[in-house]
């Protein structure tokens, strides 16, 4: 089990279509949502039987800000004008469960494949003075949200340099249409782990999560392009 801090560098673009398809809104630049964040992250793995295991992961990220627009932004059939002050925010929660089987193990290495499920909750909002056909509709807050279970396949490889040092890598992938969602998902990690004591170790890894999805729901017709990446510093406990 690992617990620690995920130092994310995030890039967020969303699209909310109106009567005609819209353009992506860059929340890092146009809405000035910060690209850097730190959040708690937890990972666990339990081996049952000689070759089977189940793993899990959880982390979330949220941020909001206020900014003066430098260009017009379109949201459904509404427009927020350049020069106006707006508030904006995004949040993402990721929970992952993965069942795997080891196919090749040795004294110093292990390789396995499996399948899992990501549960994602994503939301975004913009608030300010909205216009439609150049006429003000007044101050309002518009928000979209989506949550979905997305299945995936993946694999991992571990290599122990010595009794105390180990390299671990894993990757999950999804490219499929599921209900109202279609697109791709990548969730990858590469880590160096040091076993400082018998049951306690330290880890430094690089985490990469990317979701590019089109959404066709009654309350959100559009899409999202999300990338969260950065180091994960952890305390590892094993028994």
Regions of interest found by a model, annotated:
Residues 3, 42-46, 97-101, 115-117, ...:
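Residues on the lipid-exposed face of transmembrane beta-strands in outer-membrane beta-barrel proteins
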Residues 11-38, 60-93, 120-148, 176-181, ...:
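Extracellular/periplasm-exposed beta-strand and loop segments of Gram-negative cell-envelope proteins
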Residues 51-54, 109, 163-167, 198-202:
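Repeated loop/turn-to-beta-strand initiation elements of outer-membrane beta-barrel proteins
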Residues 150-171:
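A contiguous binding-surface segment within folded domains or other stable secondary-structure elements
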Residues 166-179, 183:
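Transmembrane beta-strand segments that form the barrel wall of outer-membrane beta-barrel proteins
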Residues 1-17, 27-62, 98, 182-190:
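Transmembrane beta-barrel domains of bacterial outer-membrane proteins
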Residues 3-7, 56-60, 113-119, 157, ...:
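Transmembrane beta-barrel strands of outer-membrane/channel proteins
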Residues 92-98, 105, 110:
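Ordered, amphipathic secondary-structure segments that act as subunit-interaction surfaces
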